[in-house]
Amino acid sequence: MDPQLMEVSQQFERFKAAFIIKDFDTCSSLLSQLKLFDHYLISLSLNALLLLTCALFFLCTRNRIPPSPQENLIMGLNLLRLLVQNRIAEFHTELGLLSSATLENPCIKHAVELEQSFMEGAYNRVLSARQTAPDETYVYFMDLLAKTIRDEIAGCSEKAYDHLSISEGCKMLLFSSDQQLLTYVNEEHPEWEVKDGLVVFQKTRETAPCKEIPSLQLINQTLSYTRELERIL
């Protein structure tokens, strides 16, 4: 077995042992260490043994211990984590491992509908989905996703406009009040200026001058190539 994979497996075994005896301080420490291997695990090939060892341990014990009542909740949170990190391919890989009955569970269904809205660009639906989250633990990831969406819109807006009115800014960035917009500007974009009821963007790009296309030169070159081809033929 790969040495790094062996280390991950050993750390995971220690994590399980600490969890069984309710040593949550050790659990927290080991979980932090396991997170460091996250990107390494992404690069692994889809080998059944590796998956069973590192990612799908619960499948091995399904017939030995009763399913956790939190199983669907945790799987739903993992899907949200992948969505927030924009790891869409892995999101769909995880979905492919779930049964049709599991896909109908509210915790899973909520994450699937959220991904569909996100990919369609229906950002209002994404933000409003926070109110229908199946569990309060989802709110953390929903807030991260909302920030990701607003940052993306903000980046596009400052490149497309010189300024926006505060009301237009609220609508564009999906805020329900002027104060929310002002707080966002102060915390996330101090380079923007708010004055006279406008949000003035600080231009970060330089407009490159358009170069004239040397059309006559291109025509002459094309005719020259044509004459050369005629000689060859």
UniProtKB/Swiss-Prot annotation:
BP-aspect Gene Ontology terms: proteolysis
N-acetylmethionine modified-residue sites: 1
Cellular component GO terms, alphabetical: plastid; proteasome regulatory particle
UniProt domain PCI: residue ranges: 38-217
Alphabetical list of Pfam families matching this protein: CSN8_PSD8_EIF3K
UniProt KW keywords: Acetylation, Proteasome
Entry function: Acts as a regulatory subunit of the 26S proteasome which is involved in the ATP-dependent degradation of ubiquitinated proteins.
Subunit structure, as described in the record: Component of the 19S regulatory particle (RP/PA700) lid subcomplex of the 26S proteasome. The 26S proteasome is composed of a core protease (CP), known as the 20S proteasome, capped at one or both ends by the 19S regulatory particle (RP/PA700). The RP/PA700 complex is composed of at least 17 different subunits in two subcomplexes, the base and the lid, which form the portions proximal and distal to the 20S proteolytic core, respectively. Interacts with UCH1 and UCH2.
Protein name: Putative 26S proteasome non-ATPase regulatory subunit 8 homolog B
Native organism: Arabidopsis thaliana (Mouse-ear cress)
